[in-house]
Regions:
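Receiver (REC) domain active-site loop signature in two-component systems and cognate sites
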Residues: 56
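Active-site beta3 strand of CheY-like receiver
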Residues: 46-51
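Active-site residues of response regulator receiver
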Residues: 53, 83
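Charged docking surfaces used in two-component/phosphorelay signaling
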Residues: 16-24
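Short hydrophobic/Thr-rich beta-strand motif most characteristic of the beta2 strand and flanking loop
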Residues: 26-33, 41
């Protein structure tokens, strides 16, 4: 079985693009449309990696990182935040919450795969 990745994004088309790239590279991928759904899935299964959007209604990406880190099984799971915002202050908040990486949107599929591979392969 391949490595499992949870993709979290409130925009369906973006979720589908990320999923297509990751599945095309042989990863097992599950989707969540928001932070609440992501937490529910994370409580039932430990993923090898989480890729989450930052700008989501309700639970944003940085808050989701913090909530995932509160689940002991996610202490060492890589979490990458995707965002159109790339400011140093927001990245610092992400790192402080426990984010492993930050990637700008729109993303380059090859760059995404390179980042994903460094954490799960």
């Amino acid at each position: 079985m391949g490595k499992s990745i949870l993709v979290v994004d409130d925009t369906r088309s973006m979720r589908k693009m990320v999923v297509a790239v990751l599945q095309g590279a042989g990863y097992e991928v599950e989707e969540a449309a928001d932070g609440d759904e992501a937490i529910e899935k994370a409580k039932k299964k430990v993923f090898d990696l989480v890729v989450t959007d930052h700008n989501m209604p309700g639970t944003d990406g940085v808050t989701l990182v913090r909530l995932l880190r509160a689940i002991s099984a996610y202490d060492n799971v890589a979490i990458i935040v995707l965002s159109t915002e790339t400011g140093a202050e927001l990245k610092a908040k992400g790192r402080e919450a426990g984010a492993t990486g930050w990637m700008a949107k729109p993303f380059d599929p090859e760059k995404m795969l390179a980042i994903v591979r460094q954490f799960v392969d």
